[in-house]
Structures are given as C-alpha cells and as structure tokens.
C-alpha cells in the first residue's frame, strides 16, 4: 500500500508539472497506459495469495480513480488557460470604428431614365411599358413601316420567326396603349430595345424613351416647346436647339433635334414629328378629329452627352472604376 501512495504522489507531481495537453497525455500513458505503473500493479495481483487479491485490487482501482480525477482536472485547467490565451491574443477593440460598407449607386443609364420620367411626369405624362418580344404588327405594320423597309431585314432586327422579334423600338408600346384606351393620350414608354449593331456608338441592346401626346388640336409648336424645355432641363443649362427636317414612317412631318455643343458643333439627340394619320387609323382613331406628336430618344446617347462619355459600350462592361464616377 505504501508503494501505491508513492505512485499516486509521483503521478500528482507529474500532472501538476505538465504545462501542455501533450505533456499531460504523456503522464497519463506513464501511469494508466498498457505498460503504465498502475496497470502493472493490476497485472501483479496474480502473484498475491488469493485472500489478499480482492483488497489489493480495490486499493489499486482507488489509486487509478485518484490519478484519473487529477488528470481530468489538470486537462480542464490547461484547456481553459489555452482558451484564455487565444482570446487574449485575438481581442477585438470594440472602441475602434467598424469597417465602412461602401454604398452602391444608381447606374448612369438608370439616372438618365429617372430624370426623363421626372420631367415628363411633371407635365402629366404617364409611364407605359410593353413586351420586349414583339410581333410584326405592333413593331412594323401599325407604325406605317413598309414591307420592304430595311428595318425588317435580318441585318437590323433579331427575328425569332417572320412574325416575332426582339422589339427594335418602344413604339410598339404606343400602339398597344392606344389600342387599349381612348384619346386623349399623354405618356412616355422607356425600355430596352434591340438592333443588330455593335460599335463605339451602338450596342445590340440599348435603352429608348419614346413619348406620345394625342388629343384635339395638337400642333408642332407644342412639340417644339416641350422638347426645348426638356433638353434645357436635362442638361441643366440653356441650350441652343435645332430642328432639322427628316423622315420617319410613323410621323409626318418629321424632324431630328440637335443641340449645339460647347465646341460649336451640332449634336443629334432625338427624333420627333406629328403622328402619321395611318398610325392613328391602325388603332381606330379618327385622324380628322385627333392629332398628336411623338418623339424618341436613345438613353445612352443622352447619358454620353451629359457625362462626357465617348464609348457607349462602357455602360455595359460593369467596370467599377467607371461606374463609381457616377455615384
């Protein structure tokens, strides 16, 4: 028994001296492993007289429990110390300012659409929308576009079949809006449109805003006044505006609108005209009673002019260095 007390004392001393979990496990193996000192004591029971084995075995098992309890307590203490040391080394100073989350911003094209909608909204224009996959009637026929017009070829238009295509303009929204209502009409139709073109000033997908006003006694002077005021509002300065005679199948007379740049050169910004009588007839409106004007503008074109961007493709390349300039 005296020998067991000595083993327990030595084991407790070794346990207290262990400064890591690895060292503590070595102490466990030394005393409780297959070849450990207390295991050897159990194995030697066979050498004792039968009447002494029971009591000796109980004493050895008690000694094992004492050592196991000491090992568990020391392991718990070492794990707590290890955790505290780790927490101390990874302490977060809560008084420091947090990492700043960078705010996003509207895309410049979205900004332009919102400016256009705001201006015309203040004049009482509603915002209308329509499908981007359009049929030939709404994209061409109802707009007085002849069957042999170049816009109807594969070179300009993305066709699914001869009667179904990606819309080439938002003019189809004008037809659908007039089909589903009665004059007077006053609305704009912003949206994505598609044409088979790609270069510095064209992309296969771009944005348009088209507008229309149909009522009794509508005239070209009203159209000129509204577009002049819009351009001055959009560029936030008094701009010189020029209307040039032009041709569009769906308006008569038609004009293209230019603004004079700071370098003295004229820059085309939109097209417009009085709604062609055939367009009104196609939706059941009497052109003898009603007249109207329509206009259309490329959103990217206006955005390029407003912000001084010289390559339209930059708007769709998602380069954050470019987009962050518009926040």
Curated annotation (Swiss-Prot):
Cofactor binding description: Binds 2 magnesium ions per tetramer.
Q: Which cofactor does it need?
A: Mg(2+)
Q: Name the Gene Ontology molecular function terms of this record.
A: ATP binding; magnesium ion binding; phenylalanine-tRNA ligase activity; tRNA binding
Domain of life of the native organism: Bacteria
A GO-annotated cellular component: cytoplasm
Its Enzyme Commission number(s) read 6.1.1.20
Q: What CDD domains has UniProt attached to this entry? A: PheRS_alpha_core (cd00496)
Please give the biological process terms from Gene Ontology that the record holds.
phenylalanyl-tRNA aminoacylation
| Major enzyme class | ligase
Q: Do you know which Gene3D superfamilies this protein is assigned to? A: Bira Bifunctional Protein, Domain 2
> Where Mg(2+) is bound, by residue?
252
Identify the Pfam families for this entry: Phe_tRNA-synt_N, tRNA-synt_2d
| Keywords for the protein's UniProt record, in alphabetical order | Aminoacyl-tRNA synthetase, ATP-binding, Cytoplasm, Ligase, Magnesium, Metal-binding, Nucleotide-binding, Protein biosynthesis
Catalytic reactions of this protein:
tRNA(Phe) + L-phenylalanine + ATP = L-phenylalanyl-tRNA(Phe) + AMP + diphosphate + H(+)
Q: Where in the cell is it found?
A: Cytoplasm
Q: Name the protein family.
A: Belongs to the class-II aminoacyl-tRNA synthetase family. Phe-tRNA synthetase alpha subunit type 1 subfamily.
Subunit details: Tetramer of two alpha and two beta subunits.
HAMAP family linked to this entry: Phe_tRNA_synth_alpha1
In Swiss-Prot or TrEMBL terms, this protein is called Phenylalanine--tRNA ligase alpha subunit
The species this protein belongs to is Vibrio vulnificus (strain YJ016)
What lineage does the source organism belong to? Answer: Bacteria, Pseudomonadati, Pseudomonadota, Gammaproteobacteria, Vibrionales
Q: Which gene encodes it?
A: pheS
């Amino acid at each position: 028994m005296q020998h067991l007390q000595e083993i327990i004392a030595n084991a407790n001393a070794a346990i207290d001296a262990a400064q890591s979990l690895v060292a503590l496990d070595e102490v466990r193996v030394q005393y409780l492993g297959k070849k450990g000192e207390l295991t050897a004591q159990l194995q030697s029971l066979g050498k004792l007289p039968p009447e002494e084995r029971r009591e000796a075995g109980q004493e050895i098992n008690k000694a094992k429990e004492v050592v196991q309890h000491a090992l568990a307590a020391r392991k718990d203490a070492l794990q707590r110390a290890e955790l505290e040391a780790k927490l101390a080394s990874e302490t977060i100073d809560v008084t420091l300012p947090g990492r700043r989350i960078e705010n996003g911003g509207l895309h410049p094209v979205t900004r332009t659409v919102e400016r256009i909608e705001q201006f015309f909204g203040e004049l009482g224009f509603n915002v209308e929308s329509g499908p981007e996959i359009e049929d030939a009637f709404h994209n061409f026929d109802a707009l007085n576009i002849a069957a042999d017009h170049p816009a109807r070829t594969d070179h300009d238009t993305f066709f699914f079949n001869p009667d179904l295509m990606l819309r080439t303009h938002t003019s189809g929204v004008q037809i659908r809006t007039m089909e589903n209502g009665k004059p007077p009409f006053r609305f704009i139709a912003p949206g994505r449109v598609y044409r088979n073109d790609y270069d510095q000033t064209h992309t296969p997908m771009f944005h348009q805003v088209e507008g229309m006003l149909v009522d009794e006694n509508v005239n070209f002077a009203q159209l000129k006044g509204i577009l002049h005021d819009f351009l001055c509002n959009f560029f936030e300065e008094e701009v010189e505006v020029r209307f040039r005679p032009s041709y569009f199948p769906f308006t008569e007379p038609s004009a293209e609108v230019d603004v004079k740049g700071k370098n003295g050169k004229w820059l085309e910004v939109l097209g417009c005209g009085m709604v062609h009588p055939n367009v009104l007839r196609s939706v059941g409106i009497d052109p003898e009673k009603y007249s109207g004007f329509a206009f259309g503008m490329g959103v990217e074109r206006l955005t390029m002019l407003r912000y001084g961007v010289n390559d339209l493709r930059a708007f769709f390349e998602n380069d954050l260095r470019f987009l962050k300039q518009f926040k």
